[in-house]
């Protein structure tokens, strides 16, 4: 066996990329030494007979590859790329209109005509892709450092790319023609030190409505920073109940305080009674909703109920909209909390009876979005004698108590007998998990499968939307139609 002991020079520049190959008997090691003869890194691997070299020059100088041991070896450099020649590939221009603009710019043209066109037709730029999908390109004009997308089809605050050195920033997505989404754009987001969460939240410093999109949500936002822009494609499902209708009598909304001995706090309950409400009506129904502020604002629940009742598609339905008493109480109360579920069943509903709002469980719907959807299903699990229908919008079924596997609530439904509860489970196609973890979309599908296997009546609805009140204001009426509508689950 020949003795391997040799030094060979390897000159490198700072930042230079060097690639090559090596092979060596198991008794041989190959090491890289710096210009002063100090060890930098091991190049060979005794568990493998051969491999690749991938190096970046730490500084200018002549480095050394040292071979030591018993056996044969060889190594060679196959590629070098100086730092000055290293450039990230240009982003792919999926948009035909942007590709045409890039061609114009390469010929010495400007972006002026392009921006005039975008302001005239409105953004985002929507181009047909195939029979079922459109290509949607979000645009921003004139940022200095970066632009990020807040909302939209991305769950990860997508970065916009700059078109050359122009004032056009863009990112494109292929989305179903049925999509409806809200979004904001954040130019020049601060690059903060610290944790990933702090850096992620920095987007809120500049996130604002798209200045070239006339469609906004809510329709009367306070300013650009409190307003979302709306992307609504041609085949987005209608939301026919969200706007006031001429000739439809409006119900009343009364705000009352309710003290809870179980929870030791006080909150506001907003009571909606439809026009002509009769406390002893034989077909009365009740809807219980969390996050009252959102469901009286972004989701116009009273208007939706007014319109649906007047059209005769649902029976007379009162609503209890529950406020969160403090800023941090939502995170304590809505994820499965026995005390909060008991408050709903043993304090809220008996109190509502005294207000002339009382129906059996089969005619009571409890619902909400995100944690509110999760809380609705848990309340029905713990108190099916009170809550016979669950209207869950993007329920957070990934949740689990600290130290336990995710999807805790789904396992609880596996463990108990089938209960007299019907379900409407809605989720958005753009609510998938990140980093290989199941998200809202996947965990709602899992709960659906478990409930159906247990014999529950379940309507499962997926829409081309995100974690978004713009979607939820539509699926609220969808869920009511399924659960208490004339042709819904209640009639099956």
Model segments located where?
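Conserved aromatic beta-strand anchor motif in extracellular beta-sandwich/beta-rich domains
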Residues: 32-34, 77, 149-151
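Acidic, Ser/Thr/Pro-rich low-complexity intrinsically disordered segments
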Residues: 2-50, 58-60, 67-70
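Non-catalytic cap/lid and distal C-terminal segments of serine-dependent acyl enzymes
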Residues: 90-156, 163-492
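Aromatic sugar-binding surface patches on proteins
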Residues: 47-52, 165-169
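Edge beta-strands of jelly-roll/beta-sandwich modules across compartments, strongly enriched
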Residues: 69-80
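Exposed beta-strand and adjacent loop surfaces of beta-rich binding modules
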Residues: 17, 27-30, 72-74, 135, ...
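Short, flexible loop/turn segments at beta-strand junctions in immunoglobulin-like
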Residues: 11, 54-58, 172-177
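Exposed beta-strand face motif in extracellular beta-rich ectodomains
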Residues: 59-63, 179-181
């Amino acid at each position: 066996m020949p003795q391997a002991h040799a030094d060979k020079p390897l000159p490198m520049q700072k930042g230079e990329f060097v690639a090559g190959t090596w092979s060596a008997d198991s008794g041989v090691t190959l090491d890289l030494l710096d210009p002063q003869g100090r060890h930098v890194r091991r190049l060979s691997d005794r568990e493998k007979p051969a491999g690749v070299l991938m190096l970046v020059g730490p500084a200018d100088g002549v480095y050394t590859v040292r071979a030591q041991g018993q056996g044969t070896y060889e190594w060679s450099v196959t590629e070098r790329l100086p730092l000055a020649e290293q450039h990230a590939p240009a982003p792919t221009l999926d948009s035909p209109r942007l590709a045409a603009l890039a061609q114009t710019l390469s010929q010495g043209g400007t972006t002026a005509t392009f921006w005039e066109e975008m302001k005239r037709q409105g953004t985002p730029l929507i181009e047909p892709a195939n029979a079922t999908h459109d290509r949607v390109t979000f645009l921003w004009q004139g940022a200095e450092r970066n632009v990020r997308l807040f909302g939209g089809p991305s769950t990860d605050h997508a970065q916009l790319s700059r078109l050359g050195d122009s004032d056009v920033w863009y990112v494109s997505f292929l989305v179903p023609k049925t999509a409806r989404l809200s979004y904001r754009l954040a130019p020049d987001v601060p690059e903060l030190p610290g944790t990933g969460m702090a850096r992620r939240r920095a987007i809120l410093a500049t996130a604002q409505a798209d200045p070239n999109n006339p469609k906004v949500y809510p329709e009367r936002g306070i300013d650009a920073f409190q307003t979302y822009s709306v992307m609504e494609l041609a085949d987005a499902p209608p939301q026919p109940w969200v706007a006031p209708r001429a000739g439809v009598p409006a119900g009343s909304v009364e705000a009352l305080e309710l003290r809870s001995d179980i929870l030791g706090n006080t909150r506001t309950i907003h009571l909606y009674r439809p026009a002509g409400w009769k406390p002893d009506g034989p077909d009365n129904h009740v809807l219980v909703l969390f996050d009252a502020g959102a469901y009286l604002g972004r989701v116009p629940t009273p208007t939706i109920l007014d319109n649906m009742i007047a059209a005769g598609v649902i029976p007379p339905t009162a609503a209890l909209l529950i406020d969160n008493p403090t800023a941090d109480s939502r995170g304590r109360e809505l994820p499965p909390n026995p005390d909060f579920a008991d408050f709903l069943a043993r304090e809220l509903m008996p109190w509502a009876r005294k207000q002339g709002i009382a129906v059996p469980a089969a005619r009571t719907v409890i619902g909400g979005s995100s944690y509110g959807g999760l809380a609705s299903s848990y309340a029905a699990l713990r108190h099916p004698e009170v809550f016979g229908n669950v209207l869950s919008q993007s329920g957070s079924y990934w949740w689990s108590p600290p130290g336990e596997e995710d999807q805790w609530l789904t396992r609880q439904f596996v463990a108990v007998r089938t209960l007299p509860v019907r379900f409407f489970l809605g989720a958005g196609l753009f609510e998938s998990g990140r980093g290989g973890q199941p998200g809202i979309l996947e965990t709602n599908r899992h709960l659906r499968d478990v409930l159906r296997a247990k014999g529950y009546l379940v309507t499962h609805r997926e829409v081309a939307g995100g974690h978004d009140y713009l979607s939820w204001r539509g699926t609220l009426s969808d869920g009511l139609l399924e659960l208490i509508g004339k042709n819904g689950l209640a009639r099956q």
